[in-house]
């Protein structure tokens, strides 16, 4: 009898696990628009990891939410970019989003049954943006991007980002007083950075 691995409540064969990890590895290779504080492009995987960390750290701020589910959504939310690469938000079209979603869903449908059902349910909830868990994920997704820009050298910013930094994600934090406070704090940081570092 072939060995099975229990991963997050999902039983799968080691070969199936390795196949999923092989796709996920592409998120380490594919870079995003933003730079890290060390001056290199950040990877999609790094972004996904940090919003997952943010969700873990905020567990006690949202005691009524299923933060384990939020973390799971955060971990897989950009898996489509393993196939398409990252497209900056100010360039991404609805057609790009549909293409990414379709490619990801086609891949999810090839997963072992339990994994397929869980991933499909998480992605459906994520895209519907109706539950508190989905709203928390989306707010963290937006905030992490702004935070990373604040951590990067301002010379890497595009002209449009001076305004975008202050408005990006604003609508996504309105559901939560805590998220509104976080956005306000990040905006203060942004203004200080611009005042200090913006080229003349």
Task: Describe each region flagged by the PLM.
Residues 2-200:
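Active-site helical microenvironments for divalent-metal-assisted chemistry
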